[in-house]
Swiss-Prot record:
GO terms for molecular function: arginyl-tRNA--protein transferase activity; leucyl-tRNA--protein transferase activity. The keyword Cell membrane does not apply. Its main location: cytoplasm. Its EC number is 2.3.2.29. SUPFAM superfamilies: Acyl-CoA N-acyltransferases (Nat). NCBIfam families: PRK01305.1-1, PRK01305.1-3, PRK01305.2-3. InterPro entries: Acyl_CoA_acyltransferase, Asp_Glu_LeuTrfase, N-end_Aminoacyl_Trfase, N-end_Aminoacyl_Trfase_C, N-end_Aminoacyl_Trfase_N. GO terms for biological process: ubiquitin-dependent protein catabolic process via the N-end rule pathway. The gene is bpt. This is Aspartate/glutamate leucyltransferase. HAMAP family: Bpt (MF_00689). It comes from the Bacteria. Belongs to the R-transferase family. Bpt subfamily.
Amino acid sequence: MHPTEPPFQRIQFYLTAQYDCSYLPGRLARSQVATPTHLIDHHAYGALIRAGFRRSGQFTYRPNCEGCQACVPVRVDVSGFVPNRTQRRCLKRNRGLAARFLPLDFKDEHYALYRAYLGSRHAGGGMDRDGPEQYTQFLLSSNVDSVLVEFRDGDAVVMVAVIDQVDDGLSAVYTFFDPAREQDSLGVYGVLWQIELAKRLDLPYLYLGYWIGESRKMAYKKQYPPLQGLVDGSWQALEA
């Protein structure tokens, strides 16, 4: 879908200045941003997601980098997904976690978990210095159909996921978890749980953002076949 087609006719698009790529060292990135945010309703947002856009706070964007197409938007066809042996073990290990749907409200324990996660996984990347205001703008500001899911082990919050719902699926916005529980593979469980949620809601897809084959942080997404990628303007199967 091209940005000049419905329902994009009232939405404008601009290109950001170039900035250092977060995933591929030594490369410059640039984004195409949809604006104004108040016109991006549920219907328009779903169309943008299908066109390869993502949401960060109230900004809806997609990569538009000169000479680079490494970022491939991907989605899981949830009806065809069958967990492998390792994923089944992960599901079994974490079945005791209690999931609770919450509005996008600030909670001190969520923010503390977010800081611990970034300090362990993304130290020195800039995000690990996010204060409460940056956290709120990034994860708790939304004009679309969004929910925060809290996962508890007893009294302890061990994982938080922010999820958007669109017409044909769920979009995994961001998930963070207790870095001290690496043996529980909570990141994997978060994806598996969202696949199961999409199935329960009778939605065909879970949108996972961008797959980048050269980035170890993003290449994991091929572990959830059947995976489709938006290539040359059309969604097509990606080889596992």
